[in-house]
Amino acid sequence: MKRIPFGIRRLDSTVDGGAPAGSLVLLSGEAGSGAREFLYTSAAMNALASADPELFDLYYGGVMETAEMPPEVHYITFTAERARLRREIKHVLNDEIVDGMADSVQFHDLSPEYFRVSPVPREWYSARTASIGGLGAADDRASVPEALGDVLTQHADDSLVIIDSLTDLISTAGEELSWSDIPQLLKGMSRAAYEWGGLILVLLNHETLSPERHGQLIDASDGTFMFEWETGGSTRARTLIVRQFRGVLSQIEDEDIVRFETEIGDAGLDISDVRKIR
């Protein structure tokens, strides 16, 4: 089965090159524990592979024979504009990586749909010039799930798709969505992802959820990476656990791996240590 690299070098080398094509993976983390940094690194490295192969080889290296880089990278955001995201990504990765990959990532800003039913003034999130003629069009704008579905249907084939974030989508529950719609939406995306043959990464801050609701989202995904802070003495470490992932977890278990330690350097997030059953 074809693999699509996560763009995290040591992780990809551990799991036979990346995720099985057609997967939806939940990146579930505590604030600052590495989930967002994983997301940024994955987008950057997969885009850099085609945008600047020499720079990609310098920071990532060779791609395993079992893996194939996606031809396109799509970044879907509900609240942040492109310029802000680029600034945030520069806090995680070297400037030359961000500059090299920027034009190869296709950003999809769904903030007009996201904020449409909120009390946030339109001029705060929309670059469109307000006019009497445009007000009716704004009222007829698609809902957030419809807009998300349109982007995925048009662009997800064989692509890496980043969704930033499920936490934002959950916060709209009660307006355009009920809570029960969220796991169903995730299951629908997972089903479609198999047909699309790409890789979908979905960011989630699980601190905002009850264990029961978190479990529903894990169950609706093909795979879940758990990012946590681990405290020992006077130090803290970012750690990554593969909670469940069909076609990947078994490989990690065969290596007796129980947890990854992560670090953030010039090339973004990577695995710094592997803990095994002793």
Where in the sequence are the language-model features?
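Phosphate-binding/switch loop-helix module in NTP-utilizing enzymes
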Residues: 109-185
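Walker A/P-loop NTP-binding active-site region of P-loop NTPases
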Residues: 14-112
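Phosphate-binding/switch region of NTP-binding enzymes
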Residues: 199-267
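Conserved nucleotide-binding/hydrolysis micro-motifs of P-loop NTPases
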Residues: 79-83, 112-115, 167-168, 206-210, ...
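Substrate-engagement module of ASCE P-loop NTPases
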Residues: 180-207
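NTP-binding/hydrolysis catalytic cores, primarily Walker-type P-loop NTPases
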Residues: 131, 135-140, 144, 154, ...
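Structural motif
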Residues: 26, 160-164, 201
